[in-house]
């Protein structure tokens, strides 16, 4: 079934949600094969396909080598190439590289964390991999400087897992890939971004909600604990255990 799944994924013309296809130059909702965008869905889809390929491509080859070839081509077409294409920076606005000072949100860490995982698992060209990592660091630096010093998520506590939580995912991926040489877990703003999830909690499963975020805590306890452990926040690890109780 894994082979069936990645084969199906490789045949799809796009992994982008139709609601986001309007950013194509064609301004149409159907995917234009001449242009590939990256959004929340395609990045996530690409990372899942890349993980499946990484662990099972030898098994796929036993069935038919065409499965692995098609998977490699699909990830390159849908994720790797458009990420490195300077002409796509306006469409991939979440990079923050098309126009400096532009508003950023949780798309930036979410997409970057998924895309960089695709590169680490699928890109065989070291020069392209280096470019991708450097670009992702530049993009994430813009996002981190966009966040206020108190570390609050401006989209509300319910978005924490898809904002600060994705920052943690991104940093953990690069930490693991570099054997710990790349680490921002000692940064105070990174810690405060994590602790926002516990400091916005008011009891009985409720948070101080605002923007379009819901009033109920919906962030996974394991993510809170892992984040807290990485940044050395007893507040977060204790809160994660409290949420499990």
Locate the predicted segments by residue.
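Carbohydrate-active enzyme catalytic cores, enriched for enzymes
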Residues: 95, 162-245
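"Short basic amphipathic alpha-helical interaction patches in structured regions
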Residues: 2-5, 21-23
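Intrinsically disordered or highly flexible coil/loop and linker segments, enriched in small
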Residues: 15, 88-89, 152, 180, ...
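Short, mixed-charge aromatic SLiMs
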Residues: 8-13, 76-77, 137-149, 188-205
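Short, flexible active-site-proximal loops enriched in glycine and acidic residues
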Residues: 12-24, 38
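Active-site lining segments of carbohydrate-active enzymes
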Residues: 29-156
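Well-ordered alpha-helical scaffold segments within catalytic/enzyme domains
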Residues: 1, 7-16, 30-33, 44-65, ...
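Hydrophobic packing residues in well-ordered alpha-helices of helical domains and bundles
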Residues: 2, 129, 133-136, 160, ...
